């Protein structure tokens, strides 16, 4: 673990030393939503709520805001000690998960479809989808979800997904 931390530290130092900050990059985050946070001020450039249809940004779970911070937090609230991987990137937030962090695959698919609709207008280049499922029997919805993820790839977007929390 110590070696892993050291490698991550060196990688982060390399990106900052080479001024890889995410400036000019818009990342769509499909998650539980997003709230205004000091580390994200002025960089939330879009919003869509596929769960409840609210027009104002919110995160009733906190996970989406956390993910956005890992991605693009500028570290101001932590006096620069903790910043995201791309501290100048912009966030296009899409709420696809409910207050408990769960959701319906159709909401995720609707979120993906919305990102594809807005990709050119908002200049979205990266899509983060932090969802996971437990192993289960084959479900037709899984195939539909994969179809739409492949549409993201076909559109030239970089897609980042969660590896899971269960090992």
Predicted regions mapped to residue ranges:
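Subtilisin-like serine protease catalytic core
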Residues: 16-27, 34-46, 55-106, 122-125
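A broad, low-specificity signal for short, low-complexity segments enriched in glycine/proline
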Residues: 8, 54-55, 88-90, 121, ...
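Generic enzyme active-site microenvironment
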Residues: 29, 93, 160-162
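Short, well-ordered amphipathic alpha-helical segments that serve as non-catalytic structural scaffolds
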Residues: 8-10, 74, 111-112
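Autoinhibitory propeptides
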Residues: 1-16
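A generic local structural motif
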Residues: 12-16, 55, 78-80, 113-115, ...
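Substrate-binding/access-modulating region of protease and related hydrolase catalytic domains
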Residues: 97-167
């Amino acid at each position: 673990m110590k070696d892993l931390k050291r490698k991550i530290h060196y990688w982060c130092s390399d990106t900052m030393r080479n001024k890889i900050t995410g400036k000019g990059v818009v990342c769509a985050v499909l998650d539980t939503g997003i709230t205004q946070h000091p580390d994200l001020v002025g960089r939330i450039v879009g919003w869509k709520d596929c769960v409840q249809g609210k027009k104002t940004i919110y995160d009733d779970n906190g996970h989406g805001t956390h993910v956005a911070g890992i991605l693009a937090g500028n570290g101001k609230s932590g006096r620069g000690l903790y910043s995201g991987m791309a501290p100048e990137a912009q966030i296009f937030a899409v709420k696809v998960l409910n207050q408990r962090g769960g959701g319906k695959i159709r909401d995720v698919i609707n979120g993906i479809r919305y990102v594809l609709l807005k990709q050119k207008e908002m200049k979205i280049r990266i899509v983060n989808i932090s969802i996971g499922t437990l192993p289960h029997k084959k479900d037709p919805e899984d195939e539909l979800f994969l179809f739409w993820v492949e549409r993201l790839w076909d559109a030239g977007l970089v897609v980042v997904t969660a590896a899971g929390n269960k090992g």
